[in-house]
């Protein structure tokens, strides 16, 4: 199995995020835009590029549970088990914010959207970066998400600081989103 965290283009993308850059990378179904979630300017640049209001919030993806542990340290055993039952995989959970996720990540919501990805390139990017990464579909608002590198370039051309290697997964729809407290499906897959 390939360790994508060692891929030169994945490493370059991780380095660009460390420097405040906005990048594109493949996910389970579509290409995503990403950046360092703790860099407010980088998130603002990503949202401006996408023409997405900050109030909508963004998803954080991680390579493993340890990378998002600080965001879930307040959960009880049953809630943690619910997460573990679906991760790694294409389910994003809305987890009550324990105060660690900044407003430019949560938007107007009291929760943070988290997913441990099972996409090998996206997980490799998180490992190369050393933590969770912002994940939102790679498209301007109102356009369909990019499903390949050609669509990424058509939408954003030279506006991105890096474009990762890899291909989007075979899923036809973006990840399902569920509310951890209610179990309700907020966005079906």
Curated annotation (Swiss-Prot):
Biological process GO annotation list? regulation of translational fidelity; tRNA threonylcarbamoyladenosine modification
Organism field: Cellvibrio japonicus (strain Ueda107) (Pseudomonas fluorescens subsp. cellulosa)
Functionally, this protein is described as follows:
Required for the formation of a threonylcarbamoyl group on adenosine at position 37 (t(6)A37) in tRNAs that read codons beginning with adenine. Catalyzes the conversion of L-threonine, HCO(3)(-)/CO(2) and ATP to give threonylcarbamoyl-AMP (TC-AMP) as the acyladenylate intermediate, with the release of diphosphate.
Q: What is its main location?
A: cytoplasm
- Give the InterPro entries listed for this entry: DHBP_synth_RibB-like_a/b_dom (IPR017945), Sua5-like_dom (IPR006070), TC-AMP_synthase (IPR023535), TC-AMP_synthase_SUA5 (IPR050156)
Tell me what reaction this enzyme catalyses.
L-threonine + hydrogencarbonate + ATP = L-threonylcarbamoyladenylate + diphosphate + H2O
Q: What class of enzyme is it?
A: transferase
**One cellular component (GO) term of this entry:** cytoplasm
Q: Which gene encodes it?
A: tsaC
This protein's name? Threonylcarbamoyl-AMP synthase
Going by the UniProt record, its keywords in alphabetical order are: ATP-binding, Cytoplasm, Nucleotide-binding, Nucleotidyltransferase, Transferase, tRNA processing
**Family assignment from sequence similarity:** Belongs to the SUA5 family. TsaC subfamily.
EC number(s) on file: 2.7.7.87
List the top taxonomic levels of the source.
Bacteria, Pseudomonadati, Pseudomonadota, Gammaproteobacteria, Cellvibrionales
One molecular function GO term is:
tRNA binding
Q: Which PANTHER family match?
A: SUA5 (PTHR17490), THREONYLCARBAMOYL-AMP SYNTHASE (PTHR17490:SF18)
Q: Which domain of life is it from?
A: Bacteria
Domain YrdC-like, residue spans: 7-189
Q: Where does this protein reside within or beyond the cell?
A: Cytoplasm
């Amino acid at each position: 199995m390939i360790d994508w965290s060692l891929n030169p283009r994945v490493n370059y993308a991780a380095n660009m995020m460390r420097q405040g850059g906005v990048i594109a990378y493949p996910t389970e179904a579509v290409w995503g835009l990403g950046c360092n979630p703790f860099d407010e300017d980088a998130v603002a640049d990503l949202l401006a590029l996408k023409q997405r209001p900050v109030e909508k919030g963004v998803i954080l993806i991680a390579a493993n549970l340890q990378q998002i542990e600080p965001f879930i340290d307040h959960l009880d055993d049953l809630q943690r088990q619910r997460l573990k039952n679906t991760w790694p995989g294409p389910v994003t959970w809305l987890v009550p914010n324990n105060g660690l996720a900044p407003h430019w990540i949560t938007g107007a919501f009291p929760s943070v959207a988290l997913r441990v990805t099972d996409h090998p390139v996206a997980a490799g990017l998180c490992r190369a970066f050393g933590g969770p990464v912002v994940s939102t579909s790679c498209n301007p608002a109102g356009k369909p998400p990019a499903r390949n590198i050609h669509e990424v370039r058509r939408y954003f051309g030279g506006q991105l600081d890096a474009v990762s290697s890899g291909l989007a997964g075979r899923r036809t729809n973006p990840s399902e989103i569920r509310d951890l407290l209610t179990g309700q499906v907020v966005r079906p897959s």
